[in-house]
């Protein structure tokens, strides 16, 4: 969290050279509480614009306030909540910790009140982007605003490896690399690689059979009887189990006439 290091002399917002503005809202009020030694810049209510980038929240004050800009990186924020009171405007609150060389020390409770609306939209997007940043993902639309019409400006997109070096003269060091690691390597070590499918056996060859004999009514009846007694397994539809062939019945001899016996 840095104090007065993200604004230009012309009143624009300065973001890192690999970041861009994902979302912004005007008519926002910023207040601080729970500080042991309150610096002059943290006293009172600050009015201005809040900006969301892929890795931090930046508040830009209007007028000649002692706090011209205030930056909160996600990895130093905790206990963030979106509140919808019955009376009054919706707001976002949480706790932020100072970073080394940020212009102040300790921690503080902050409250961002959206007097003209937008707290829910901004808060939900902030939580989503913070979660993506913690996993090393690039948020959707991270490079959507190359220039802000209000005079604010952003720097070019990030380099190929996803990490962002500071531009010349940037007033504070980048966060430790463990907070925003690059995208994970997609190799076998991930544990989610599916095994290759089994080899395709190819089309089934027709069975080899001898020369077909002319069909007769007796042969067709016997084949129909064998098919009726076959067993079909739905789990193995390519095989049909046939009963073992039985010997033919003995020939039929009509009984002799008793008169001839």
Curated annotation (Swiss-Prot):
Complex and partners: Binds to the WW domain of YAP1, WWP1 and WWP2. Interacts with NEDD4. Interacts with ESR1 and UBE3A.
Positions of the GRAM domain: 1-84
Phosphoprotein keyword on record: yes
PANTHER family: WW DOMAIN BINDING PROTEIN 2, ISOFORM E, WW DOMAIN-BINDING PROTEIN 2
Cystines in this chain: none
Modified residues annotated as Phosphotyrosine in this record: 192, 231
Main location: cytoplasm
Lineage per the UniProt record: Eukaryota, Metazoa, Chordata, Craniata, Vertebrata
Protein name, entry field: WW domain-binding protein 2
Post-translational modification: Phosphorylated in repsonse to EGF as well as estrogen and progesterone hormones. Tyr-192 and Tyr-231 are phosphorylated by YES and SRC inducing nuclear translocation.
Main function: Acts as a transcriptional coactivator of estrogen and progesterone receptors (ESR1 and PGR) upon hormone activation. In presence of estrogen, binds to ESR1-responsive promoters. Synergizes with YAP1 to enhance PGR activity. Modulates expression of post-synaptic scaffolding proteins via regulation of ESR1, ESR2 and PGR.
One MF term in the entry's GO annotations: RNA polymerase II cis-regulatory region sequence-specific DNA binding
GO CC, any one term: cytosol
Organism annotation: Mus musculus
Tissues and organs where the protein is expressed, per its UniProt entry: Expressed in the ear and the eye. Isoform 1 is expressed in brain, inner ear and organ of Corti. Isoform 2 is only detected in brain.
Stretches with biased composition (Pro residues): 196-209, 245-254
Keyword Nucleotidyltransferase: no
CDD domains the record matches: PH-GRAM_WBP2
Biological processes annotated in GO: cellular response to estrogen stimulus; establishment of protein localization to chromatin; positive regulation of intracellular estrogen receptor signaling pathway; positive regulation of transcription by RNA polymerase II; progesterone receptor signaling pathway; response to estrogen; response to progesterone; transcription initiation-coupled chromatin remodeling
Notes on the domains: The PPxY motif 1 mediates interaction with NEDD4. The PPxY motif 2 is required for the coactivation function.
SUPFAM superfamilies documented for this protein: PH domain-like
Cell compartment(s), UniProt: Cytoplasm; Nucleus
Mutant lacking the gene: phenotype: Mutant animals have a progressive high-frequency hearing loss. They show swelling of afferent terminals and abnormal expression of AMPA receptor subunit at post-synaptic densities. Mice are fertile and show no other abnormalities.
Segments of skewed composition (Low complexity): 210-230
């Amino acid at each position: 969290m840095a104090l007065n290091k993200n604004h230009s002399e012309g009143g624009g917002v300065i973001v890192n050279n690999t970041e861009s503005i994902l979302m912004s809202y005007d008519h926002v009020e910023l207040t601080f509480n729970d500080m042991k030694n309150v610096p002059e810049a943290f006293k009172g209510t600050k009015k201005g614009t809040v900006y969301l980038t892929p890795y931090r929240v930046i508040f830009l004050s209007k007028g000649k306030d002692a706090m011209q800009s205030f930056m909160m990186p996600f990895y130093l924020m905790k206990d963030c909540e979106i509140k919808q009171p019955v009376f009054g405007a919706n707001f976002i609150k949480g706790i932020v910790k100072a970073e080394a060389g940020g212009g102040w020390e300790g921690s503080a409770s902050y409250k961002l009140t959206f007097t003209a609306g937008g707290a829910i939209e901004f808060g939900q997007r902030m939580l989503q982007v913070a979660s993506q940043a913690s996993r090393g993902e690039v948020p959707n639309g991270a490079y959507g605003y190359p220039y802000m019409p209000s005079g604010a400006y952003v720097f070019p997109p990030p380099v190929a490896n996803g990490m962002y070096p500071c531009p010349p003269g940037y007033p504070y060091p980048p966060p430790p690399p463990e907070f925003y690691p690059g995208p994970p390597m997609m190799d076998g070590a991930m544990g989610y690689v599916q095994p290759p499918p089994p080899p395709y056996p190819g089309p089934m060859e027709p069975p080899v059979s001898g020369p077909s004999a002319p069909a007769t009514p007796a042969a067709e009846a016997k084949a129909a009887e064998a098919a009726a007694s076959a067993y079909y397994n739905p789990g193995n539809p390519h095989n049909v189990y046939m009963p073992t062939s039985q010997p033919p019945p003995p020939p039929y001899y009509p009984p002799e006439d008793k008169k001839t016996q």
